[in-house]
Amino acid sequence: MSWGSSAAKFLASASTVLVVRWLRRHSQQRALLRVWSAKRRPVTTVDATIRLPKEDLDPDLAGCDSVAQLHERIAKLGLPPLVPREMHRCSVSLAGRARKLLGLTTSFTVMQFNLLAEGLSSGPHVEPPFGRAGVKPSGYGGFDAVARPEVVFDWSKRKLRLVEEILRFLPDVLTVQECDHFADFLLPALRTAGYDGVYAPKRHSPCLEFGYHSDGVAILWKKSAFAPIGSERRYFIEDDGSESGRPYLLALLRHRECDSTLLVATTHMKAKLSQPNEDLRAKQITQLLDALEESAADKADAVMLCGDFNTDPYDEPGKQVAKCVPAVLGHRLGLRSAYPLPRSEHNGWWTTWKKRGASEVKHTIDYIFHSSGLQPTSVLAPPAVDDLEEARLPSIRYPSDHLSIAAEMQMP
């Protein structure tokens, strides 16, 4: 048999597979749309433990109807450029490269970003939305080593810098945490770039202690790349069966080009290293993984779990035995990390690096996990140390104490 006839048979077989896959997915998605639409729970302010901004639109976005206008407003801030970042190529198998060459796979990008809530970083001179009576005094989130804090933490500037960081990479899927201005700022700002999204606020958010709005988690997607099938907001369950104040969010998306379905989940785990906190993180992440497994069964072609887990991948001697990340990697879903998982802070990969008082911490605590059918082809590397300020993050050149992390993925 000639090479040409073999290639023709291979391509014909591949075309048949694609047609069958398309028909199967469309029949599934019609049923899924009914199920997920019934599950979806809108975010309201009826819950007294949640406080959301009353304004429909941030006044600073008035008249801003395009990405170009948004960039103009960012430029008017007169701040230095954001720290440079580059994508780092991953090793891709020969089969993966061949599938891409033959058009049998589709690429998309995903970004994970803890925004650093306004309510957890505002200055002492700023009047909180709900007043100062009975609340803790704010003090730039304890970032006392940051130079020019009155500029770095000025929300009118920092919110635009956060959007600038997102727009310079334009991810197809975006997951965020510590978002306390979703409906009034983040979503309308990113809608100018063609995004839509869903949001889940925390109950009893720590931001309330300072007189600010509740923070929460969100999933956004570029409408030109993905169509939403449905979303669901849940809260972790306590030992007594009641709902906790900590949410997680699921969104089922259909890729417009290849028609594959992607189930995305995000959450923000409890902070601070300690064994009791790590035990709680492991217990709660197992709840989320089980929910993902249930939702993904016969419904999603691929799964992604992104978030700020507030824990390292490995043991911290004298502080905690790692359980949370091992629970993810050992679960039946078979998730993998898009990024290398460093064993020490001296490794070049990290997601947060900050100074508070005499304390300096450098950790990997933000993650992008994916199912085996997805193949990362590149990931967003941390900035060079020489490009960071003495106080590391945040700074005049970076708007959060967490780096955004991002990966380009091949989708089957």
Regions found by a protein language model. Give the residues of each.
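Acidic, histidine-bearing metal-coordination/catalytic regions of metal-dependent phosphoesterases
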Residues: 2-12, 18-145, 187, 193, ...
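Metal-dependent phosphoester-hydrolase catalytic domains
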Residues: 9, 44-100, 172, 182, ...
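Active-site metal-binding loops of divalent metal-dependent hydrolases
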Residues: 115, 269, 308-309, 403
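Stable alpha-helical elements in mature extracytoplasmic
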Residues: 158, 182, 186, 281-284, ...
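Acidic/histidine-rich helix-loop elements
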Residues: 115-157, 206-209, 240-242, 270-280
